[in-house]
């Protein structure tokens, strides 16, 4: 059982992107849900609007599945939850699982949330801080606050590390002789 990374209240994951070390790859995945109320599905989970949300419609666990076309390196999962707005719909226990498909998923994180308000940053790294490589991620809501039945999640973002290109590793041309040949005419 782990607790998510401590981040300042409301820490926007877009700040991670601005550092240039990660990029959001949710658009590369095929998203599916275990259930949803009409008008409260994947589109609302991915629309960058903190006022909209996915609402499940059925028994627990409530599942969000992300499937990638090829094995993908993932570093951080960000979930937006708001206890003040959602009360008993707010997740209190979440399991994050990865694998090649539905049949071999393995839990890599289990989170206990206490009245969350804002972005929850979940590292998807091993003990050596190495990012996970996977075809599939499953986020399972195992319990809600106040024993609520259905759940609300307002946003989910998934990040991969940005790899340095070899072009940036070449030394700069600093002498006049080198500068004459730095571009093609």
UniProtKB/Swiss-Prot annotation:
Q: Which residue positions does N-acetylthreonine occur at?
A: 2
- PROSITE patterns reported for this sequence: DOC
The biological process GO terms on file are: anaphase-promoting complex-dependent catabolic process; cell division; protein branched polyubiquitination; protein K11-linked ubiquitination; protein K48-linked ubiquitination
Give the Pfam families listed for this entry: ANAPC10
Q: In which pathway does it act?
A: Protein modification; protein ubiquitination
Modified positions (N6-acetyllysine) are: 169
- Enumerate the spans annotated as DOC domain: 2-185
What SMART domains would the database entry show? APC10
Reply yes or no: does the keyword Acetylation apply.
Answer: yes
InterPro entries tied to this protein:
APC10/Doc1 (IPR016901), APC_su10/DOC_dom (IPR004939), Galactose-bd-like_sf (IPR008979)
Q: Where is the signal peptide?
A: none
Keyword tags: Acetylation, Cell cycle, Cell division, Mitosis, Ubl conjugation pathway
Q: Supply one GO CC term from the record.
A: anaphase-promoting complex
Quaternary context: The mammalian APC/C is composed at least of 14 distinct subunits ANAPC1, ANAPC2, CDC27/APC3, ANAPC4, ANAPC5, CDC16/APC6, ANAPC7, CDC23/APC8, ANAPC10, ANAPC11, CDC26/APC12, ANAPC13, ANAPC15 and ANAPC16 that assemble into a complex of at least 19 chains with a combined molecular mass of around 1.2 MDa; APC/C interacts with FZR1 and FBXO5. The C-terminus of APC10 binds to CDC27/APC3. Interacts with PIWIL1; interaction only takes place when PIWIL1 binds piRNA. Interacts with FBXO43; the interaction is direct.
Its function?
Answer: Component of the anaphase promoting complex/cyclosome (APC/C), a cell cycle-regulated E3 ubiquitin ligase that controls progression through mitosis and the G1 phase of the cell cycle. The APC/C complex acts by mediating ubiquitination and subsequent degradation of target proteins: it mainly mediates the formation of 'Lys-11'-linked polyubiquitin chains and, to a lower extent, the formation of 'Lys-48'- and 'Lys-63'-linked polyubiquitin chains. The APC/C complex catalyzes assembly of branched 'Lys-11'-/'Lys-48'-linked branched ubiquitin chains on target proteins.
Q: Which family does it belong to?
A: Belongs to the APC10 family.
Protein's UniProt name: Anaphase-promoting complex subunit 10
- Organism of origin: Bos taurus (Bovine)
Q: What is the lineage of its organism?
A: Eukaryota, Metazoa, Chordata, Craniata, Vertebrata
Query: Corresponding gene?
Result: ANAPC10
